[in-house]
Amino acid sequence: MTGKKRSASSSRWLQEHFSDKYVQQAQKKGLRSRAWFKLDEIQQSDKLFKPGMTVVDLGAAPGGWSQYVVTQIGGKGRIIACDLLPMDPIVGVDFLQGDFRDELVMKALLERVGDSKVQVVMSDMAPNMSGTPAVDIPRAMYLVELALEMCRDVLAPGGSFVVKVFQGEGFDEYLREIRSLFTKVKIRKPDSSRARSREVYIVATGRK
């Protein structure tokens, strides 16, 4: 992509971003990101979070989902969060900065979970997008497979999993894999998710 084309594309993205009603609402409410609204819509539909829960948040920065979940699980709840990027502290959130694909980071995350019974694993992870689906989709699928592996390791029976997935090659196989592990699986496209985006959210409940 030439610099001129990239500049035009970036300008369009910025214009769309700042005119987005959810971005504007997030700024007014002092929220960390518009992702807060996506999780709020999912919670209204699926009632994933309850007071006192332990939750794992993958791809947490800048903290929109953790910020939302804190309001749902209360002071006795606990969030263990991880992201490659830094995140400003949130009371009630134990944050680990590191690459979730790195075995040492995964080990450190599991150590922080310890013997806790995790009721929800949530992942809003996404790779740096190149704009080429043949490159981006496999990278994204690798991340969501790792998130599902985390579910296998830490999620308590009856627990829930919410994960952002980009529709494309590997999506149907991944959905089948999730259905084999959970009793109820739904696909959500929140209103606050941009219509042109390939992203959807798989909401799986009732870990077998």
Swiss-Prot record:
The active site is at 164 (proton acceptor). Keywords: Cytoplasm, Methyltransferase, rRNA processing, S-adenosyl-L-methionine, Transferase. Gene3D superfamilies: Vaccinia Virus protein VP39. It is an enzyme of class 2 (transferase). The keyword Cell membrane does not apply. Its EC number is 2.1.1.166. GO terms for molecular function: rRNA (uridine-2'-O-)-methyltransferase activity. It catalyses: uridine(2552) in 23S rRNA + S-adenosyl-L-methionine = 2'-O-methyluridine(2552) in 23S rRNA + S-adenosyl-L-homocysteine + H(+). It comes from the Bacteria. Its main location: cytoplasm. GO terms for cellular component: cytoplasm. It holds the Pfam family FtsJ. Signal peptide: none annotated. It is found in: Cytoplasm. S-adenosyl-L-methionine binds at residues 63, 65, 83, 99, 124. InterPro entries: RNA_methyltr_RlmE, RNA_MeTrfase_FtsJ_dom, rRNA-MeTfrase_E, rRNA_MeTrfase_gammaproteobac, SAM-dependent_MTases_sf. Belongs to the class I-like SAM-binding methyltransferase superfamily. RNA methyltransferase RlmE family. NCBIfam families: PRK11188.1, rrmJ. Specifically methylates the uridine in position 2552 of 23S rRNA at the 2'-O position of the ribose in the fully assembled 50S ribosomal subunit. This is Ribosomal RNA large subunit methyltransferase E. It comes from Salmonella paratyphi A (strain AKU_12601).
